[in-house]
């Protein structure tokens, strides 16, 4: 949902985000004698943001270098240089995975809340400033509220999702995917009306549910359902991460549902300026990731840092509608 294009990596401290509404206007009928009628370009908004800085690092000491590494044979026959190279690759992989999880969190928060709050840290425990990014003025209109919970009497899962699709369609925006939290997904599998509509003997074909794992951790493709002509790919999301308190947290709420479409946003990156190892001048890099090596020869230590300045931004105003349609199961 948030790919990075060639124009999304900036060689600047700030990035420019552009987003606009959909287009539902009609072309006018024109008298041949008039020639043509000029039309204005769709209005759009441009905002400048300074992306937050992400920079995990890992220190390699002489003591760690002489220890047997994780997964290493008991008598490996590795010398210090070989072990250091292996540790370097492992450290780089660990830091890349942590940054990728943070980017996933930013994308999820932006889809859910039309923005996100990025809490800076001075060190591993001390909080710094909170950076707030909002892609709307005043109040956001991206939320749809179900009149009744779907798993309570009077709930209308099919009607509410169709209404969400029509809200997007009325603005000239696509509706392709239905993303569900685990509680909502479990409810749909037990919903009697859904079972009846999926019965091929009924003569009304509304889709098929055939669950299968996807290439993404914690994401299940449930099938395709037809909501008043809107054919939606249905996904269940159960992916979690470890938050700052050490507790497990969900990227997507268990009781939430969202109608959206691929390519609804993009991941942008600001530049990073640093003094590289062995250099005396500063260099500015426009890249997704920027590595830096710091060597302290006096203490026989080496530190590897992986820097990143990402910003998840929507491409279209009010593209995403999210609801909390089910009561949490005990």
Give the location of each predicted region.
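Long, contiguous amphipathic alpha-helices that act as assembly "spine/axial" helices in icosahedral shell
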Residues: 54-137, 156, 160-161, 165-186, ...
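Extended oligomerization regions of viral-like shell subunits
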Residues: 171-271
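Single conserved hydrophobic/aromatic residue that forms the stacking wall/gate
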Residues: 320-330
């Amino acid at each position: 949902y948030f790919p990075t294009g060639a124009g999304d990596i900036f060689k600047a401290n700030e990035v420019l985000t552009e987003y606009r509404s959909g287009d539902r206007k009609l072309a006018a009928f024109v008298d041949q004698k008039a020639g043509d009628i000029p039309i204005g370009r769709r209005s759009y908004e441009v905002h400048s943001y300074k992306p937050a800085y992400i920079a995990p690092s890992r220190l390699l000491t002489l003591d760690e270098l002489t220890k047997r590494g994780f997964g290493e044979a008991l008598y490996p026959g590795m010398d210090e240089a070989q072990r250091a190279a292996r540790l370097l690759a492992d450290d780089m992989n660990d830091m890349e995975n942590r940054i990728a999880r943070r980017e996933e969190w930013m994308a999820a928060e932006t889809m859910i809340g039309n923005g996100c709050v990025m809490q800076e840290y001075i060190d591993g425990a001390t909080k710094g400033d909170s950076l707030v990014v909002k892609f709307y003025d005043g109040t956001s209109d991206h939320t749809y509220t179900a009149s009744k919970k779907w798993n309570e009497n009077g709930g209308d899962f099919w009607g509410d999702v169709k209404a969400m699709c029509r809200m997007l369609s009325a603005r000239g925006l696509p509706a392709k995917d239905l993303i569900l939290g685990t509680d909502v997904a479990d409810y749909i599998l037990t919903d009697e009306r859904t079972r009846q509509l999926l019965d091929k003997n009924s003569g009304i074909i509304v889709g098929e549910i055939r669950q299968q794992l996807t290439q993404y951790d914690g994401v299940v493709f449930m099938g395709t359902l037809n909501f008043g002509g809107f054919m939606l790919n249905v996904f269940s999301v159960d992916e979690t991460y470890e938050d700052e308190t050490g507790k497990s947290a969900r990227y997507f709420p268990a009781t939430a549902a969202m109608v959206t479409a691929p390519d609804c946003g993009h991941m942008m990156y600001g530049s990073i300026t640093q003094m590289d190892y062995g250099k005396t001048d500063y260099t500015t890099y426009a890249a997704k990731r920027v590595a830096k090596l710091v060597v302290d020869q006096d203490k026989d230590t080496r530190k590897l840092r992986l820097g990143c300045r990402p910003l998840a931004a929507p491409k279209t105003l009010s593209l995403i509608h999210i609801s909390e349609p089910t009561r949490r199961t005990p």
